[in-house]
From Swiss-Prot:
It is a peripheral membrane protein. GO terms for cellular component: plasma membrane. The complex is composed of two ATP-binding proteins (MetN), two transmembrane proteins (MetI) and a solute-binding protein (MetQ). It comes from Pseudomonas fluorescens (strain ATCC BAA-477 / NRRL B-23932 / Pf-5). PROSITE patterns: ABC_TRANSPORTER_1, ABC_TRANSPORTER_2, METN. It holds the Pfam family ABC_tran. It is an enzyme of class 7 (translocase). Its main location: membrane. One of its GO terms (molecular function) is ATP binding. SMART domains: AAA, NIL. It catalyses: L-methionine(out) + ATP + H2O = L-methionine(in) + ADP + phosphate + H(+); D-methionine(out) + ATP + H2O = D-methionine(in) + ADP + phosphate + H(+). This is Methionine import ATP-binding protein MetN 2. Transmembrane segments: none annotated.
Amino acid sequence: MSVATLQRKLPEAAPRRAGQTELHPELNRAQVRFIGLGKTYQGQQGPVQALHDIDLSIQRGEVFGIIGRSGAGKSSLIRTINRLEQPSSGRVLIDQVDIGDFDEDRLVALRRRIGMIFQHFNLMSAKTVWHNVELPLKVAGVPKAERERKVRELLELVGLKDKHRAYPAQLSGGQKQRVGIARALVHDPEILLCDEATSALDPETTQSILGLLKEINQRLGLTIILITHEMAVIRDICDRVVVLEHGRIVEQGPVWEVFGNPQHEVSKTLLAPLQHGLPEELQNRLQSHPTSSDAALVLSLRFTGSSHEEPDLAALFGALGGRVRLLQGGVERIQGHALGQLLLAVQGSSLEAAQLRQRAGQWAQQVEVLGYVV
């Protein structure tokens, strides 16, 4: 078996109806589109609005991340894609078709085009790996020979071909999630929804699952839409990201752009664990003015990804003059862009603080003078 046997020609967008308005090229490529989407629940104390006027497009074949604090509306949003949640207002379009008025038969067909995996694996403990994956095909009335072929291919794809007789209790968390992924792929979906799919896994297992999702995305052309509270997951796998707060979009864009230079306070808070904060020991020593001739000026340099090249540290240090020490930081690449932060201590330079800041600005997109230390 080859993964190629699972590949298929992705359907074209629905044909344009007579008199239908020509769409912007970006929207023509959109596989999932939310237009003015709202969702209200009836709570004990009255109506609770989970989503407010969401306008968002997700392109075919991309890995799209949705982040936000608890209660921001993330799960409500993705569950409208397969109509597990019915919007209170607005529309959801898949391949430019409004799914709002689908009858039961069309909903069943839609849900087979959309796979879903969860934080909790939802496997049947009394069934083997093979039968857990096979069950949706059996329910759909797929002939036995076709079921066997499909299950065999999928277990090979997710790296579990030698575990087909095992029961869930005999599997690790990562292996259970691989079964969940295989089960989500049985109907050759075009879209895969991931709701906190790695939250219950250890870091090493998380990386292996992310590697599998990347492979599925690249080889099968699958659109992946994922929710996570782990910002490193978004950084490692997503093409674009949207930030929700109280059911509203507060920021969206390419991952490198949002991570490199977050604009909204919610984004900054969510991404703070990935940032290099000022060490407490250094913070306690910082002073606003130099107290001796050997005091060092502390600069914070941020690289927000607008350059594809890593900073030339030798040239930077030379331009600052004096003795330059790297206190903390690093630069990494996200989607080919250089992002990161450096904390530098500059001692004995003939340049004033404003001049040092200006010089450093030739390499870094954001430069801040933090103070002086001895």
